[in-house]
Amino acid sequence: MQKRLHYSSLEINRRAEELIQHSANRYRITVQIANRAKQRRGLEASEDLDDLPLKPVIRAIIEMSDEVAQPELLADS
């Protein structure tokens, strides 16, 4: 299954707003997104993957919004 690698800025904004709406605390979800992005950036740096088209913060927003929208993704882990 091939994933889409390009997302419009409107879609990223919509997903970020959905995350904020589903969260009880705006600050906490912002920190969670930042921590996920920081963790991703560290993993990418250690693996030396320069060809990834998405920035870590955008990838974190997409992943976290997918987890909220599709909780069955977490059930497999």
From Swiss-Prot:
Reactions performed catalytically: RNA(n) + a ribonucleoside 5'-triphosphate = RNA(n+1) + diphosphate
GO-annotated molecular function: DNA binding; DNA-directed RNA polymerase activity
Keyword Cell membrane: no
Cleavable signal peptide: none
Keyword DNA-binding: no
GO CC annotation, single: DNA-directed RNA polymerase complex
EC top class, as a word: transferase
SUPFAM superfamilies registered for this protein in UniProt: RPB6/omega subunit-like
Domain of life: Bacteria
Keywords: DNA-directed RNA polymerase, Nucleotidyltransferase, Transcription, Transferase
Disulfide cysteine pairs (residue numbers): none
Single biological process term from Gene Ontology: DNA-templated transcription
Enzyme Commission number(s): 2.7.7.6
Free-text function comment from the UniProt entry: Promotes RNA polymerase assembly. Latches the N- and C-terminal regions of the beta' subunit thereby facilitating its interaction with the beta and alpha subunits.
Family of the protein in this entry: Belongs to the RNA polymerase subunit omega family.
Record's subunit section: In cyanobacteria the RNAP catalytic core is composed of 2 alpha, 1 beta, 1 beta', 1 gamma and 1 omega subunit. When a sigma factor is associated with the core the holoenzyme is formed, which can initiate transcription.
Name recorded for this polypeptide: DNA-directed RNA polymerase subunit omega
